[in-house]
Amino acid sequence: MYHIFQISSEVFRAFGLKMKILLTLVFSGLLIWSVVLVSFSNDFNNQLLVATSNVSRESETPRDRLIGGLLTADFDEGSCLSRYQQSLLYRKASPYKPSEYLVSKLRSYEKLHKRCGPGTDAYKKATEILGHDDENYASKSVGECRYIVWVAVYGLGNRILTLASVFLYALLTERVVLVDQSKDISDLFCEPFPGTSWLLPLEFPLMKQIDGYNKGYSRCYGTMLNNQAINSTLIPPHLYLHILHDSRDNDKMFFCQKDQSLVDKVPWLIVKANVYFVPSLWLNPTFQTELMKLFPQKEAVFHHLARYLFHPTNQVWGLITRSYNAYLSRADETLGIQIRVFSDRAGYFQHVMDQVVACTRRENLLPEPAAQEEPKVNISRSQKLKAVLVTSLYPEYSETLKNMYWERPSSTGEIIEVYQPSGERVQQTDKKLHDQKALAEMYLLSLTDKIVTSARSTFGYVAHSLGGLKPWLLYQPTGPTAPDPPCIQSTSMDPCHLTPPSHGCEPEWGTNSGKVVPFVRHCEDRGNDGLKLFDEL
């Protein structure tokens, strides 16, 4: 019996040793597998976070997530992915660097907004004065908190351009900018200022009235000037600024130096605008001195302001990154083409298509289709791929271009891929998904290497200026034939102020506002109308 137990004991010891080895192997395997899983999970999360894993880059230099100091690092990245990721999608770093003075001014503004923004005692006190509309504020101190309210009107391109303009004015005059949230602004953009909100509270005392403000409103600045109802001894608690395409000469006096000394004393400004009015601010000598320090590269004003202010929400950023990765990231070269038809009977027009083709071929942006098929079929994988992103309400333009390079090869041997994200035929401003798609397409256009845009199009202005691109501008057709020449390349990327003051601020009303200062001149796509900032003299 003893021998049996002795044998059993040895068997168990041997079995126990094998079990230890087996368990060690199992646990080692599990440990290695868990490390692999964690690594895979982290990698997956990182890819999900950036959503740009296959973005092609020309260099391996680290991306500048704060864009030269434009952005502060005080935000949680996950709440707004685009804020710190936008620089990753651009193939080249922007040659336009923000000045140290601009960066310093933005940090100071953020502190001001935090002290005076919604929810603060200062904001509560400032709104109380709006209940006393008959009072004169000429001799009263309103403290450091003065405000300018941006009201959303017209299409998305107009809104982005005007909001940037209003913010710059706030920066110059040390006002706090508040944004009308009755439309879909919060579905499109993240909050731009840390620790506070730029959204105008819905209980704002004038909220129910501001939609009805127009040139006839008694507190409209142009109307008050006309009626001689405002001067240094008669200052109302709020003013309405009408900076629209139908502004009168008196409305446009707002840009003048002596008028600003009056406007500066008003605690609240309410603005409706549908034009990019930044160039006209440079006509004011006081503003001009400050603007020169803020923007040594004058044509980069909107470029910097847009990259600071406008960060698409995560939902919109998903539209952008998925489209970019699927259609643009693998291309050797990308071209954006934005087509806007200004016509009572909009749609697909052959002369517009002819104009686009003529422009892209003449400027060597796209190759001509080959006259005939090559005798040998090129199946090389090293052929150059050029991706063409087309944005238009009408899909027929991209379909025509796509068929052109499907039916015949390109004369250069390049592979031409044409892609249009959407073609909704009708502009549907204030419909959430429509506006989100429109914003995504503006950003996608800004990511291309070269860009062709339609004259007068605010959609196009936003896209090329955001991307730091000097566009080829398609002249607006004046009849049923394509213009000749079809387009012109701009020497400045800044947008155009489409209906600016026609005169300077001096008494001689005949002054040409395009000749007041050498770097504010008429836009290439507007003849003797419109003002634009140029660096090239």
Swiss-Prot record:
Glycan-modified residues: 54, 231, 378
Cytoplasmic topological domain: 1-20
Pathway connected to this protein: Protein modification; protein glycosylation
Annotated localization: Golgi apparatus, Golgi stack membrane
Gene Ontology CC annotations of this record: Golgi cisterna membrane
Cystine connections: none
UniProt cross-references to Gene3D superfamilies, sorted A to Z: 3.40.50.11340
Coiled coil (residue ranges): none
Top-level taxon in the UniProt lineage: Eukaryota
Any single biological process term in GO: cell wall organization
One Pfam short name: XG_FTase
Membrane topology: Single-pass type II membrane protein
Keyword terms of this UniProt record: Cell wall biogenesis/degradation, Glycoprotein, Glycosyltransferase, Golgi apparatus, Membrane, Signal-anchor, Transferase, Transmembrane, Transmembrane helix
GO MF: galactoside 2-alpha-L-fucosyltransferase activity
Main location: Golgi
Listed EC numbers: 2.4.1.-
Lumenal side: 42-537
Tissue and organ distribution: Expressed in roots and flowers.
Transmembrane intervals: 21-41
Family: Belongs to the glycosyltransferase 37 family.
Function: May be involved in cell wall biosynthesis. May act as a fucosyltransferase.
Protein name (Swiss-Prot/TrEMBL): Fucosyltransferase 6
